[in-house]
Design a protein with these regions (language model features):
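Non-catalytic cap/lid and distal C-terminal segments of serine-dependent acyl enzymes
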Residues: 1-525
């Protein structure tokens, strides 16, 4: 099926590049042909052709634009898609055409009924006395090097079959007698298990924390949450009736599989933590509160307080599943929650501030607002050492350290302060025409791309008259017209792609500055 076609393969990229190149060449040839169909101008004629009245060049010019414009627009769409494909291959935000289709046009959640919570954990169901997991939780691991492993696993409890990626520290051996902690890492939307590991550079960062004694030996697990096309577009944290049982997948199947494959992993809640980015950050916090018998701590990076996607965002469920509400009203064992976002991330900054001072008896909620970074992989990667250091100090993370903590520190200055007042008009105008999210920049880019799009067929037509008056062979004229058409077409495609990217970035609130955007996207280009 076309929905299962991979969009991260080199074959797909080469196919897109070939189609785009063919479209550009054919469009340039069309533009040249339209220009060369015009007869030599007579005195008083401007850009006349042999098919119409020479006294009506404007009408004939419109016909040329209408003839070539669809081809130019197709090229712009193809170039935009090609650039997006190249970026996606590096960031691994979506893996198939079906995932992209679901993100663009998500289907509404058919149910607003929350299913029962899973009762299992790494050692098996809570009603099972034996800590030995069932044999059906075994899976075959593919060694990808540098401590990375991959498996496609079928969860017996959830019925979900999907990818899980696992990182093991240096010199890991199943029989080394070491008790390993487990950090479960959840990706956001869009995202994949591979993208979150690579974007956060998680292996080297966790290994460095282990080497420095900041955290005990730890295995990192990144399950895919794109368990079907619905979840790829509108992911859940919980088991929503009528949808895939993602909650059971994360809370029971993945932990049991990990403990089966890595028997040295701990089974107590102090040894297990969740962390996530964006929507995965909310899911990490939500799951830790709901299953505090399995997970003792969570890291919420650029997540939200009120659920805004998935089944929990339904009005019938969202109020009861807001994090601040769950922390104060939901019965749970004491947990630690590390919450972080950037001041310039308008999508979640207020949600982060709402969690200051939240928490029930025994909970520890630490809030940090980074001065900049937006909603980006660069920010999350930079903040991983801070999260790991925080996690390593939590009671129970190191076996035998269950003593109560001291009072939580005061939130960072940026987190404690309310949002800044609106800047003066000159500052806002400057930001509008220089900042990556500025409306002025996008307006100018949009107008320029429209003008270039229209100029693609018009300029060669005008240039044809100039070349005819200057003499020269027909072949030379055709080459000059082709070069002019190609330059204009490529410029129009580039400017249109940039304009679309700026609009998407503003809507998504991803990158607050040009430099942050280049840090994330530049390597892909």
């Amino acid at each position: 099926m076309i929905s299962h076609v991979s969009v991260v393969s080199h074959r797909f990229l080469l196919g897109c590049a070939a189609v785009t190149a063919c479209a550009i060449v054919l469009t340039v040839l069309l533009i040249v042909r339209l220009a060369l169909r015009r007869r030599e101008p007579r005195a008083g004629d401007r850009c006349a052709d042999d098919l119409g009245d020479s006294r009506r060049p404007a009408a004939r010019g419109r016909r040329i634009v209408l003839a070539a414009l669809p081809a130019v627009l197709v090229c712009e769409v193809l170039v935009t898609g090609l650039v997006a494909t190249r970026i996606n291959m590096t960031l691994q935000l979506a893996e198939t055409i079906g995932q992209i289709s679901g993100i663009i046009d998500p289907q509404p959640v058919a149910s607003s009924v929350l299913g029962p919570l899973s009762t299992g954990g790494p050692a098996g169901p809570s009603t099972t006395a034996s800590p030995v997991p069932a044999e059906q939780y075994r899976a075959d691991l593919e060694d990808e090097g540098s401590g990375l492993h991959r498996t496609v696993f079928h969860g017996p409890a959830s019925g979900v079959t999907d990818e899980v990626r696992i990182w093991t520290p240096r010199d890991y051996r199943p029989d080394d007698g070491v008790a390993y902690n487990v950090l479960v890492l959840l990706h956001g939307l869009p995202g994949t298990s591979e993208s979150v590991l690579s974007a956060l550079d998680i292996g080297p960062q966790v290994q460095d924390a282990i080497d420095k004694g900041g955290i005990p030996p730890t295995i990192v697990v990144a399950p895919s949450l794109n368990v079907d096309e619905h979840q790829s577009a509108d992911p859940d944290c919980a088991d929503i009736v009528g949808r895939a049982k993602v909650g059971t997948w994360v809370q029971e199947d993945v932990p049991r599989m990990v403990h089966t494959l890595f028997p040295g992993t701990r089974t107590d809640r102090g040894g297990w933590a969740l962390a996530g980015v964006s929507s995965g950050g909310y899911c990490a916090a939500w799951t830790t509160i709901m299953r505090s018998d399995v997970f003792g701590n969570a890291g919420d990076m650029s997540g939200y307080n009120v659920p805004i996607i998935g089944g929990l965002s339904d009005p019938a469920l969202s109020a009861d599943n807001t994090l601040t509400t769950l922390l104060t009203r939901r019965a749970h064992s004491p947990i630690g929650l590390w919450v972080m976002s950037a001041v310039d991330d308008s999508t979640v900054t207020d949600a982060t501030r709402e969690l200051i001072g939240a928490g029930g008896p025994g909970d520890r909620v630490d809030v940090t607002l980074a001065p900049e970074g937006g909603h980006s992989g660069t920010l999350w990667k930079e903040q991983i050492p801070a999260f790991l250091a925080w996690w390593g100090r939590r009671p129970g993370v190191v076996p035998g350290t269950d003593a109560p903590e001291t009072a939580p520190p005061a939130p960072t200055a940026a987190a404690a302060q309310p949002a800044e007042s609106r800047p003066p008009l000159p500052t806002r105008l400057a930001a509008s025409f220089t900042g990556i999210r500025g409306k002025g920049v996008m307006t100018l880019m949009g107008l320029a791309s429209i003008l270039l799009t229209i100029a693609c067929p018009i300029v060669p037509c005008r240039l044809r008259g100039v070349l005819a008056g200057a003499g020269g062979t027909g072949r030379r004229r055709a080459l000059v017209l082709a070069a002019a058409g190609a330059v204009l077409l490529l410029a129009a495609c580039a400017l249109t792609t940039l304009t679309i990217g700026l609009v998407v970035n503003r809507i998504g609130g991803f990158y607050p500055t040009w430099s942050v955007a280049w840090e994330n996207i530049g390597p892909a280009l």
